[in-house]
Amino acid sequence: MLSLEECTDAQIERLIKPTFYENHRAIRRRQEDLFNKLCSVLADYAFVEDMVKKINTSNSDCDCDCDDCYRNVFANLRCGAWYANYRLSKTCVFKSIDGHNQNHQFSKQRLNIDVVLRASLRGGYCAIVDATKSRTKRFPDALGKTVPIWAAVINRAVAFDVLALRRRDSNSNSNSDMWYRYCDGEIELHEDELPEFVSENELSAIRVKMKQFVKDFKSVCADDCFKELVEALARSGPLLCKYVSRNNAFDDVKHLKERRM
């Protein structure tokens, strides 16, 4: 380190008056210390608690620390476990790597059948909790791409069997109409099945792989499990994805509550 006598005027000025960039870096370092990171986790945990409460009841005094409120909440491992009640929430595994651009995959090891069965209960839904460290993405690829691809694959895999079952059921309703869009011969992927931030090029790349994804799912899903899925989704209708963040929490939570009624 130079002494003041050895410093030039420019170096002394920088010591006394740091540049904007140096100030910005110093602030960033302070914001990313352990205390601030834990405060951020706590704030997001409180946000999840509030959303769970709003979805489950209109009573603002509801105690979220109960089995009923968390019966449909899944923490996506591992990151999501920081933000959901670890004692009450269930867990699922959707990997971001399966949704990375130019590397879209359907995992034969991570079918997450329990998520489907829970979402298909009467008035049911599933809230999958996850987070991303990206400063440019609102949702991690696990939520924004892997989950909707997974839902689209399962809808197409069971569509024909669901329609056949509903035709035999005298109590079938207009819910059947929703299934016809998943029975196209080319297993077309519709634009509204993925979030708006997925580009058209990426959507086209996923479409090309959908037929193989459906085959992959059917090749590993046991017959008894497949039958259970068909019966469950025949009652509830196809899987639909909604994305809730701080920016759109009110509108989408209101929509979820309306669907459950």
Residue spans of the language-model regions?
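Non-catalytic regulatory/accessory regions that flank a structured catalytic core
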Residues: 1-261
